[in-house]
Design a protein with these regions (language model features):
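Fibrous stalk/shaft segments of extracellular and virion attachment machinery
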Residues: 1-44
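Surface-exposed molecular-recognition determinants
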Residues: 34-207
Length: 207
């Protein structure tokens, strides 16, 4: 044994798999690090599309998900989300929306609650008269894959309100009251096109 009481790894017989994603525990086993997020899907484009489909991202592997998205929409169009059900069809009903917006001029636009309706409407527009602005959103999605619970989303977003001509902070929650499994989602423009767009989906690692 060296004078500093250390033992080289070469002299240890550890169980498990040594890799860049594991660490050596005190009981001499290699294990995956807990916590953090795992990138599941990255979707982006720079040509006109009227909708963006992100399918087969919700599974039994994760309970919670983070979705980051940024895009521009032509025609000052609003946009909405629909879940993709386990059979591949769109969920077109039973969305309850809770909606508030903090406007740059200091006012708070309380849009209250709406629903049940056919979509989760989450964006006014991207401020198409401001060429450098994109609408950006961070979704937290809870239990979308479970067939025994309602799927819920919170939205923390920023964009532009063309009717008021001011930037806005978007604060939302959405509940789909159908108790069913969802495997993905679709973002759809009311009119016009998305271009450019970028969406990344992460699974929150179960402890």
């Amino acid at each position: 044994v060296p004078s500093d009481s250390t033992v080289s790894l070469a002299k240890l017989t550890a169980t498990g798999t040594k890799s860049s994603s594991t660490f050596l525990r005190g009981d001499n086993t290699f294990a995956e690090a807990g916590g953090g997020m795992t990138l599941i899907n990255a979707t982006s484009g720079s040509s006109n599309v009227t909708s963006i489909t992100v399918d087969n991202v919700f599974t039994s592997t994760y309970d919670f998900y983070k979705i980051f998205m940024s895009f521009r929409v032509s025609n000052n169009a609003g946009y909405y989300l629909r879940y993709i059900k386990a059979d591949g069809s769109d969920r077109t009903s039973d969305y309850i929306n809770l909606d508030g917006r903090l406007i740059q001029n200091g006012t708070f636009e309380d849009n209250g609650a709406s629903g049940p309706v056919s979509t989760f409407y989450f964006g006014r527009n991207s401020g198409s008269d401001i060429s450098s602005l994109q609408s950006s959103h961070e979704f937290t999605v809870f239990n979308p894959f479970l067939s025994s619970t309602q799927s819920t989303i919170t939205n923390d977003g920023v964009g532009y309100h063309d009717g008021i001509n001011n930037y806005l902070k978007i604060i939302q929650a959405n509940i789909n009251t159908n108790v069913e499994s969802h495997r993905g989602f679709k973002i759809v423009a009311n009119s016009g096109n998305f271009n450019p767009y970028s969406i990344k989906v992460f699974g929150v690692t179960n402890a």
